[in-house]
Amino acid sequence: MTQWSNWAGTATASAQVVHHPTDLDGIVTAVAAAAADGKRLRPLGSGHSFSPIAVADEHAVDLSGYTGIVDVDVAARRVTVRAGTTLRALNSALDTLGLALENMGDIDKQTISGAISTGTHGTGASFGGLATQVAALELVVADGSVLRCSANERPELFAAARVGLGALGVISTVTLNCVPSFVLAAREAPGRLDAVLERFDEEADGSDHFEFYWFPHGDKTLVKRNNRLPAGSTPEPLSKRRQYIEYQLIENRLFGAVCRLQRAVPRLTKPTQRVVANVLSERKYSDVSHRVFVTSRDVRFVESEYAVPRDELVGVITELRATAAK
């Protein structure tokens, strides 16, 4: 048996058999082997889901050896990529082609198949999640058949498989609609929760990508606004020194130390939350899109996400604020 754990350490498994295909035939063979044994087969990505979605106690297929771009249509801004390719590797390859993903989340360690299958998303009212950028999929289903699907070919399968949770088969390739490379201007600044909530609609509609982080037990937030710059704009990233201080020292080492302290001494949670909120500073910079979207995450964390109607958000945050104060 092979021991597996997800990134956050919230799910573990000991699969009886782990397949490591390096080509399409290898994926078909893995599916056939599981079927012949009468066992369930789970695809494994990078383990960045917090739930036990990838837990496999019978057969698992690890696609980390099945990577890379297999086809490019620069004129149509469309690329086909193998399922085990990470978002980081994909972004690097797209850079050389003058292309980019239209939108993405703030982690790039996921495989492309795992990211779309679990509904990975970014921010921005006018931009969808990764699954909305998928033009076509190739899927190995339970009987070993290799099916291609798109909006025009097997549209019902395509609609389901884009966020299929690995339940419909093993994705072998993903064809993505891309956009020309672009530069994002980022403005990140501390703010007061009341002010953010009061201006929420204006802020959300006024930026291509808007989000805020609230620190419970206080009224401080970190507000992030990202906006596309005109084509041909020159990136103006933070200096290497500033990046090291902001991202490595403050957002990872200091934050990690605070988290460990709070777990060891829970009564210090409220005061340390306030300390963390008060060390935030404003920063403005611009860079190639994925370098702005993605944030380095060395501190392991567990996250739950809830979707609420936009016009209910202020009320929900107000209730959470009251609950946290108790």
PLM region spans:
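Noncatalytic alpha-helical scaffold of FAD-dependent oxidoreductases
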Residues: 1-326
